[in-house]
């Protein structure tokens, strides 16, 4: 596997996934593409209207770009080539479209960690990517290494 698509957001599990993806690409002499999905939705429109300072979308985009810059810095320090992209849409659908269109040979993403009851929790986007991906998917827990909580599908 040489083409790894990393779906990244600002969460401990996602940042751990970024570190693992960079390491895998380095070991496999592959290519890395990092994608962050800005969720389109009605909530953002309401927040934009209600926020006195405005610019909710702009702040979210700046935060997303900061996450992508973090991944680019990780890759640069490891000598790994990386492409970063920011897309808007529904997360699972956008991740799958990026994986298909690139084409990725492996999708790496962070798991959601633990729910309120302390049990492992996997968000709906991760579940949908696992269900509909046509390439292997590696879900990384917040600790950074695949473990009993990590799930591989494919």
Language-model region placement:
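Glycine-rich, Arg-bearing micro-motifs that act as flexible, cationic patches
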Residues: 106-131, 146-150
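Conserved beta-strand positions in the Rossmann-like core of class I SAM-dependent methyltransferases
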Residues: 33, 83, 138
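Short secondary-structure boundary segments
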Residues: 36-37, 110-112, 141-142
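Acidic, proline/glycine-rich short linear motifs
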Residues: 36-66, 146-154
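Small/aliphatic-rich secondary-structure junction motif
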Residues: 2-51
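Structural beta-alpha unit
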Residues: 73-107, 144-154
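Intrinsically disordered or low-complexity boundary/linker segments at protein termini
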Residues: 1-16, 131-154
